[in-house]
Amino acid sequence: MKRLFCKKVLGGFALVLMGAFVAVPAAMAADVAGANISGFVDVSYSDADNSNSTFSLDQVEIDIEKDLSDKLSIRVDVNHLPDTALVFDDLIEQGYLTVKLDNIGTGLDVTLGKFNAPIGFELLDPVDMYQYSHALVFDNGLPTNLTGVMGAYKVSDMIDVAAYAVNGWDNSSDNNQSKTIGGRVGMNAMPGVNVGVSLITGTNETTTVDKRTVLDIDATITMIDNLTIGVEYNSGTEENANLTSDGDGEWTAFLLMGHYDLDDTYGVTARYDTFDDEHGSRLGNSVVEKQTALTLAGTMSLGDGAGLLAEWRRLDSNQNVFNGSTEDSTDTFAVEFTYSF
């Protein structure tokens, strides 16, 4: 089964490479052999006061979607990040089958494979972001991808639910006997207000049965024309992960973002986020600390799928954890160009 899936993925990738020699209208997905092909290129320049400045090819991604029937579809996201090895797990950001069971209520969608974690406000890909960087809660309080099975059901026009059983946080193959389980309830509370409540819990280590549990609440508010407001609250525990004494490691995080489109071309963004690593278990610095970030960005649409943004980000800690543990703050400036098709 694994070999068959690999052949399908590689076959699709070969099809994409062949399609690269065919003219494709800008900012439009290609349709080749019944498959919808889209993707993006992400390049940047960044300068941090505690490290070198650099130009970077950050990501190249090609997404392949195909309906095999009215009840079965597949999707594969082939994604290369230059800093990762050319191994299967790194190349395939997502790869899954979706089965539509229309005879169950309003319709149950069952997804099997590797998929982006349905939790939190921010999304993974840069073309879906208003800033160059992700917030602290995205980087430290949430999984990125999950591998397993997920069911999604639309209860009504106002409520949808999803539940899943997976191999753990960002594990394509499980490293223990237990499965991580989770779910999300999405609510369209009123026009222009969408709220999601997510819970995920399970074992993520090979040598222990200690569980990591996270409650995450996110909201997207678009009640005012041209203004998008994002809010997220995250609370997590990991059993026996307290670095200061016996007990569980705990953390809380918060995000508030606002983006305003000045017109069809220009936009401005501000984001404030915090991460309180109460027992030193999540930020990776082996100390109890609280980090706070302020991010300001300007966006510009260049048309035909092209976009440009400039970002300044100030990251502060109540401990000296930057520049070789000698400073408690760091500033980063970045310019990013993306092209999606």
Protein language model features and the residues they cover:
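Outer membrane beta-barrel
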Residues: 30-170, 177-182, 186-195, 257-262, ...
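Flexible, surface-exposed loop regions and adjacent strand-edge segments
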Residues: 56, 127-133, 179-181, 249, ...
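C-terminal closing repeat unit and adjoining cap/tail of repeat-based domains
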Residues: 295-313, 317-319
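Detector for outer-membrane/organellar transmembrane beta-barrel domains
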Residues: 158-159, 178, 183-292
